[in-house]
Amino acid sequence: MDKPRVRFAPSPTGYLHIGGARTALFNWLWARRNGGTFVLRIEDTDRERSTQLAVDAILDGLRWLGLDWDEGPGVGGPHPPYFQTERLDLYKAHAERLIREGKAYACYCTREELDAQRKQAEAEKRQFRYPGTCRDKPYDPSRPHVVRFRVPDAGATSWNDLVKGVISTPHDTLQDEVILRGDGVPLYNFGAVVDDITMEINLVGRGDDHVNNTARQILMYEALGYPVPTFAHFPMILGADKARLSKRHGATSVTAYRDMGFLPEAVVNYLVRLGWSHGDQELFTLDELVRYFDLKDVGATAGVFNPEKMAWVNHEWLKRRSPEELAKLALPHFRAAGLPAEDDEKLRHVCAVARERAKTLGEYVQQFRYFYAPIALDPKAKAKFLTADTRPVLQAVRDAIAALPALETQAVEQVFHGEAERRGVGLGKVAQPVRVALTGGTASPGMYDVVQILGKDETLKRLDEALRIAGEPG
């Protein structure tokens, strides 16, 4: 069996979305497991919507996920170029060959004529199919025309899909579709076939929204006289409402999840499990995925995208990182929020306490910004815990911390425990007013960690402000 040559062929009309990323991942894993080749091709024939910004975003997204390509933009390869707009002569040559052999023909029908036929079909409540008006007309390259592929009148085209099994499409459900526009730009099916032939792709793995294209493409392979590749159509990714995943379900681009503070290994881990499994194992390194992944284990049932489960997976991966690693990862997120964080012991301590609480690096910033910015006092917490009744506790803790030569853990703990014992109350009666004073809210890491992270000067400053508030008339 030949080593697999697979491809990922995105259209640069937007960011790398979740569905596309999973398609790339499945192809990449299959190539890596079998010593094959992963080709990246950019299908940029939609000139109005394709942008260099989108190309860059797709490449950046793949690199961030760790999906390197063996041939394609930036790395070259034996079958250049890797942008469809640079391959127009190739499509023209293949189309003209099909015309010469009677397997395609020039269609001279005007847009107005075709629109009139469509309207008539609508009025008669039937589906419009091109009637083959120009099938037998002589080829006149001097006349404006498109090129149509000649579909056999009878029979059916079948293939054994690696994921979906045997699929058959009757030819009478197909029409003579346009394969080359008048400006020389190929339509999707023809461009993909010519590219896959010339790039020697022998396995086409893609989303199952392309199933309906497959019979048409197989007919084109056969007409051109080339071997038909193996096809694998991966199940759709749906939102919680079982509709196709879209922006209304929340973030759908890889870039968005990177910016929210997801780790690439977590995104890869979650995406691969949307359609593939290996026993009960939930978490996989990329090396493990290369070792275990098999297309025969990809299910045919659509996967439901669950942001909460994805966040859980990310949290598990964050917990595997050391505070030192987390600090380097979290620093750009703190700085992007305008917070004066540094890669220092303070940030490492913040990450150590955040690791068990926050599921994304973005949540590190959201939940613990009070370590780097003035607190935003929760009105309910302020009304309940910064009062004349709690002022003595706040004062006692403030004075005890001021007297400490250093904020060693045991000494800080003793401040809180000692005050609770002196007052004959539970630890919460002491800690909670101080927590509100130092963080602005009623939920935080342990007060010993909070005091140590803030440092003595900032802790005393915030306690002094809390004492001022607690002394105000209610």
Curated annotation (Swiss-Prot):
A motif ('KMSKS' region) lies at residues 244-248. It comes from the Bacteria. One of its GO terms (biological process) is glutamyl-tRNA aminoacylation. ATP binds at residue 247. A motif ('HIGH' region) lies at residues 10-20. Keywords: Aminoacyl-tRNA synthetase, ATP-binding, Cytoplasm, Ligase, Metal-binding, Nucleotide-binding, Protein biosynthesis, Zinc. It catalyses: tRNA(Glu) + L-glutamate + ATP = L-glutamyl-tRNA(Glu) + AMP + diphosphate. Its cofactor is Zn(2+). It holds the Pfam family Anticodon_2. One of its GO terms (molecular function) is ATP binding. It is found in: Cytoplasm. InterPro entries: aa-tRNA-synth_I_cd-bd, aa-tRNA-synth_I_codon-bd_sub2, aa-tRNA-synth_I_CS, aa_tRNA-synth_I_cd-bd_sf, Glu-tRNA-ligase_bac/mito, Glu-tRNA-synth_I_codon-bd_sub1, Glu/Gln-tRNA-synth, Glu/Gln-tRNA-synth_Ib_cat-dom. The keyword Metal-binding applies. Binds 1 zinc ion per subunit. One of its GO terms (cellular component) is cytosol. Its EC number is 6.1.1.17. Zn(2+) binds at residues 107, 109, 134, 136. Belongs to the class-I aminoacyl-tRNA synthetase family. Glutamate--tRNA ligase type 1 subfamily. Monomer. Catalyzes the attachment of glutamate to tRNA(Glu) in a two-step reaction: glutamate is first activated by ATP to form Glu-AMP and then transferred to the acceptor end of tRNA(Glu). NCBIfam families: gltX_bact. PANTHER family: GLUTAMATE--TRNA LIGASE, GLUTAMATE--TRNA LIGASE, MITOCHONDRIAL-RELATED. This is Glutamate--tRNA ligase. The lineage of its organism: Bacteria, Pseudomonadati, Myxococcota, Myxococcia, Myxococcales.
